[in-house]
Amino acid sequence: MFLAFDDTDSPSGMCTTYLMEEFLRKVNLDVIGYPRLVRLNPNIRYKTRGNGALSVHLGRGIGKKHTIGELHGKILYGYAEGEDEYDENVLYVMKDLVEKYSELDYFNTNPGIVVSKNPFPENYYWSALEREIRIEEAENFITENNGKFLKFKSGRGIIGSGAAISWPATRTTYEILAYKYPHPEEIETEKKMRLSILADTFRGTFNNVDIANKYPAIFPNPKTPVIFGIRGLYPSVLANAAKKVIDDGSINYDSTVTYLTNQATDDHIIDEPNVIEDLHSYKITAEIIDKPFSVAGGHYFVRSISRAGEFTAAAFEPTKEFRHTFSKLMPGDTVTFYGSFTNGNLNVEKMQIISVSRVFSRVTPLCKFCNTRTKSKGKNDFRCPKCGRRYNTPDYHEVKREISPGKYDVPVVARRHLSMPFEIESMFKTKINALEA
């Protein structure tokens, strides 16, 4: 059977994943595979923080088992295979946890729980990445597929819960999270940076640290029970990385849990659309048609044209040094942008410069007799300051471009959960499902 839940946190506290940690401590069924953390449309206006739903496949484990984590000193195992066992009581175990831990006083927190004997059709997952789904639409979908749901307040969380059960897990990464309830001890920034750099030394991990911007990315909001989270391609490597961070940092923790995720998979990206729609995320190859311009706040914009028509690509202030490259684009450049289209702009998450145009500057001609640079005396009137000879045609010199074809990521501090950094792209090509050989 499958259980999923969503929308239990708020901007000021809690983390939906912590309810999974508590659920796994209480449930009497085995975990088949890994618990799942599924990120959905990053543009949805109702999201409380990271727009991630949780799900888990439950049953009676068979055969080889693997370590998922450690729950208050007890090792938690998962199984590659299992016999299905449907126990509707897990819905009410989860209900108690939602009532105990959710940020129900926050106006935009509207939890939802879903259970099902079978996974849902994957088309619903892709819809939840691409557009805004109504609560009534989610109710109908879950009911039509023989699932059951439980709503708190408006119950908007059933939308993400249904999508988490629909996720086909065709491209995957992992994240290991360490917890301390109600929140971890305060860790100074210098120590966070040191431990984030340490995590970054482990094979296949990513988005751990941004040294240039002094951002220790593995450490989230200290108001939640999450101490740190390390993302990567190999669960056994993540377990070793977490142990090293805990030991070297002398970190007091309650539990660790490894999740199978769709983070850094680009699942939200629609490839080369014919039409651009609001709240969707795209990969768009376009030609630059104007020079970039900036506005107050350090945001940069550039007009571009693709087969879907004209649009404005944007690099906002949080993308930091990425804006320097973005600002050097010129008319005629061909660029593939990746990003989300909101409020009339494509908010760029990364870009690949395919080709750069040749740029020429207009200069006064050299005197053929004196080899001296002439001076402009008016429109198409150039005179040699030495001999006085006149010329009516300017010279043009090619300007060396400050950028070149290549792949450009925004810095770690600005990366979104679903966006795949170019640095791990080759790993997906050789190991599509990010599973250990």
UniProtKB/Swiss-Prot annotation:
<protein>
    <recommendedName>
        <fullName>tRNA(Ile2) 2-agmatinylcytidine synthetase TiaS</fullName>
        <ecNumber>6.3.4.22</ecNumber>
    </recommendedName>
</protein>
<dbReference type="GO" id="GO:0005524">
    <property type="term" value="F:ATP binding"/>
</dbReference>
<dbReference type="GO" id="GO:0016879">
    <property type="term" value="F:ligase activity, forming carbon-nitrogen bonds"/>
</dbReference>
<comment type="similarity">
    <text>Belongs to the TiaS family.</text>
</comment>
<dbReference type="InterPro" id="IPR053870">
    <property type="entry name" value="TiaS-like_TCKD"/>
</dbReference>
<keyword id="KW-0547">Nucleotide-binding</keyword>
<comment type="function">
    <text>ATP-dependent agmatine transferase that catalyzes the formation of 2-agmatinylcytidine (agm2C) at the wobble position (C34) of tRNA(Ile2), converting the codon specificity from AUG to AUA.</text>
</comment>
<dbReference type="Pfam" id="PF23783">
    <property type="entry name" value="Zn_ribbon_TiaS"/>
</dbReference>
<dbReference type="InterPro" id="IPR024913">
    <property type="entry name" value="tRNA_Ile2__agm2C_synt"/>
</dbReference>
<dbReference type="Pfam" id="PF22641">
    <property type="entry name" value="TiaS_TCKD"/>
</dbReference>
<keyword id="KW-0436">Ligase</keyword>
<dbReference type="InterPro" id="IPR013696">
    <property type="entry name" value="TiaS_FLD"/>
</dbReference>
<dbReference type="GO" id="GO:0002101">
    <property type="term" value="P:tRNA wobble cytosine modification"/>
</dbReference>
<dbReference type="InterPro" id="IPR055394">
    <property type="entry name" value="Zn_ribbon_TiaS"/>
</dbReference>
<dbReference type="Pfam" id="PF08489">
    <property type="entry name" value="TiaS_FLD"/>
</dbReference>
<keyword id="KW-0067">ATP-binding</keyword>
<dbReference type="GO" id="GO:0005737">
    <property type="term" value="C:cytoplasm"/>
</dbReference>
<keyword id="KW-0819">tRNA processing</keyword>
<keyword id="KW-0963">Cytoplasm</keyword>
